[in-house]
Amino acid sequence: MSLIYLVVLALVQGITEFLPISSSAHLILAPQVLGQADQGPLIDVMAHAGSLLAVLVYFRSDIVSVAMGKLALLQGRVTPGGRLALLVAASMPPIIIVAGALVAFDLVDALRSPRVIAIATLAFALPLWLADRYGRQTITIETMSFKHAALIGIAQLFALIPGASRSGVTMTAARGLGLTRTDSARFSMLMAIPVIAAFGLVSLIELVRADGMAAGASLSDGLIVAGLSFVTAWAAIAVLMRLVERIGFLPFALYRVGLGLALLVFFV
C-alpha cells in the first residue's frame, strides 16, 4: 500500500470523521477514486483509533468530568459530569440495537454503493441547513433533557446509511430540537466516542479473523494512518467548533450539495 494512499486515507478519516459531511462516504470512495483496493480492517482500526484519541484529547475536560461523575453516580450522587454521562448513554440504545443487528446478519455492506452515497449526501444537506437556519438556540447540554438525548439517538440511526453522516444527522437533530450550535456539535462529538470505539472493535474483530493483516497493510502502515488521523481530526474539531459558532452549518450543507452532485456525475 503506497505512502500517498495511506496519507490520503488518514487525512480523509481525520478531517471528515467529526465534520457533518460523512467520513464513511469519503473512505468508501477513496479506494475507487484512487484505483486502490479496499484498505482492509487494520487500516480501519488504526484510523478509528487516531480519531478516537483526538476527540478524547480535545474534550479532555468533559472526559474527566464524566469519569468523575460516574464515580459519583456509584455513590448515589448526580454531578454535571454524571448527568452528561447519562445523557450520552440515553442516546446509545437505538444505534447499538440496529447496528448490532446489521452486523449479526452481515448486512453492513448492503448499502455501500456510490449511488446510495450520492443520494444520501444530497438528501441530508437540506435538513442540516434548515435545522440550523430556523432552529432556536435556547438549550444547552446542561439544560437538555433525556428526551432530547433519546431523540438525537434515534436520529443517529440514519448514520447507518453511507453518505448520511453520523455527525451530520446528530447535529441536525440537536439544532432542530433547539440546542445551541456549539453544544449541538459538542454533544454530537461526545456521542461519537462510544460509537467510534464500537466500530473500531468490529474492525478489530475483522482484523483477527483476517489473521492479522489485510489488503497489503502492515503495522507501520497502520501507525502512519493512526498518527495522521489523530492530528487532522484534532484540527478538524477545533475548526468545526469555531466555524459553527461564527457562521453555522451552511458551509457544510453547501459542501454536501457539491459533493453529492459530483458523485452523481462521476459514478452514476
From Swiss-Prot:
The chain crosses the membrane at residues 1-21, 39-59, 85-105, 110-130, 144-164, 187-207, 221-241, 247-267. It comes from the Bacteria. One of its GO terms (cellular component) is plasma membrane. InterPro entries: UppP (IPR003824). The keyword Hydrolase applies. Keywords: Antibiotic resistance, Cell inner membrane, Cell membrane, Cell shape, Cell wall biogenesis/degradation, Hydrolase, Membrane, Peptidoglycan synthesis, Transmembrane, Transmembrane helix. Its EC number is 3.6.1.27. GO terms for molecular function: undecaprenyl-diphosphatase activity. It catalyses: di-trans,octa-cis-undecaprenyl diphosphate + H2O = di-trans,octa-cis-undecaprenyl phosphate + phosphate + H(+). The keyword Nucleotide-binding does not apply. It is found in: Cell inner membrane. Its main location: membrane. It is a multi-pass membrane protein. GO terms for biological process: cell wall organization; peptidoglycan biosynthetic process; regulation of cell shape; response to antibiotic. Catalyzes the dephosphorylation of undecaprenyl diphosphate (UPP). Confers resistance to bacitracin. Belongs to the UppP family. Bacitracin is thought to be involved in the inhibition of peptidoglycan synthesis by sequestering undecaprenyl diphosphate, thereby reducing the pool of lipid carrier available. This is Undecaprenyl-diphosphatase.
